[in-house]
Amino acid sequence: QTRSAVVAAVANAADQAAGTGDKARVVVVTTGTEQDMDDAQFTSALDDATSKDVSLSVVHVGEGNVDAALKSAADSFTTVDSTDETQLSGAINKAAGI
């Protein structure tokens, strides 16, 4: 259900950005994707939901399968080892713009 959650989060961020005039960032931390929509549906839904003021950053943790469509859609995508707490923390902070 990662894909539908990402679409909802991006749509919410786009609404927030439009309402405030500020840019918004969506950070997704995932261990893999349970596909609830195919690649074409996901890409189309994400294109409909997003705006120029929203960025999507994804941190993929561990050895699970990387969602190629999510990776392609992300403005930034990082894969980290789940056993390296420092690397994980750094990747999340970077994705969040901290």
Where are these regions (language model features)?
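Von Willebrand factor
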Residues: 1-25, 36-37, 59-66, 86-91
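Short secondary-structure transition/capping segments
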Residues: 11-14, 72-75, 98
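VWA/integrin I-like adhesion module and closely mimicked acidic/polar interface patches used
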Residues: 32-83, 90-95
